[in-house]
């Protein structure tokens, strides 16, 4: 009963995408969302905050790990690389930076807007251990997290090659869906697509 109730709560929350005051209003707000340690919105700040949290863990001799997710368009921000340089210098092996590498940002293809490639080599230059994976493959994601846990003396960057809008037929590889909600008809199609994708995952 608990599991069913929880699933219903999650589903109810999903329909509040972009509604002001909801969990999914847009950018996460630490005052309203349990488990969120930092309000965000401005591009480039997440990695810096994560580096600070990881450094605090080292200074306080705490045994925790910090995971941060950033976009491949977002790493065009210089602040990301300042943070990466410091993290590598301090050998923050409790830090994992995951780059969502779908090659699309709000303005189009990232390699045409301002190419950050090769992403893995750039992180390696700042003393990161890098892992390149298929970011739509859960087995590869799990394996990368395990590898990151075993890595000592340097932070880890996981370059997750993904498909934007994966699983929703009309959203896949479409930059236009970067920040808008579907209409009622599109919502119904998307839910059917995702239910099929979910069933396929459960059969693996």
State each model region's role.
Residues 1-10:
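Single conserved hydrophobic/aromatic residue that forms the stacking wall/gate
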Residues 14-23:
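A glycine-rich, hydrophobic loop/mini-helix early in the fold
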Residues 11-13, 183-184:
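General structural signal for secondary-structure boundaries
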Residues 23-204:
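Glycine-rich ThDP/TPP pyrophosphate-binding loop and its adjacent helix/strand module
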């Amino acid at each position: 009963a608990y599991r069913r109730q929880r699933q219903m709560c999650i589903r109810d929350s999903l329909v509040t995408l972009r509604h002001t005051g909801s969990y999914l209003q847009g950018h996460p707000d630490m005052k309203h969302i349990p488990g969120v340690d930092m309000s965000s919105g401005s591009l480039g700040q997440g990695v810096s905050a994560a580096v600070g949290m990881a450094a605090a863990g080292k200074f306080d001799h705490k045994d925790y790990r910090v995971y941060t997710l950033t976009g491949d368009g977002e790493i065009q921000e210089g602040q990301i690389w300042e943070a990466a340089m410091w993290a590598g210098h301090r050998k923050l092996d409790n830090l994992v930076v995951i780059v969502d590498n779908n090659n699309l940002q709000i303005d189009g293809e990232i390699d045409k807007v301002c190419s950050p490639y090769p992403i893995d080599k750039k992180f390696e230059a700042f003393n990161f251990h890098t892992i390149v994976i298929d970011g739509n493959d859960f087995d590869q994601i799990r394996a990368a997290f395990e590898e990151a846990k075993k890595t000592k003396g340097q932070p880890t960057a996981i370059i997750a090659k993904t498909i934007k809008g994966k699983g929703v037929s009309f959203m896949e590889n479409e930059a236009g869906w970067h920040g808008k909600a579907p209409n009622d008809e599109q919502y119904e199609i998307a839910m059917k697509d995702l239910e099929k994708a979910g069933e396929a995952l459960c059969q693996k």
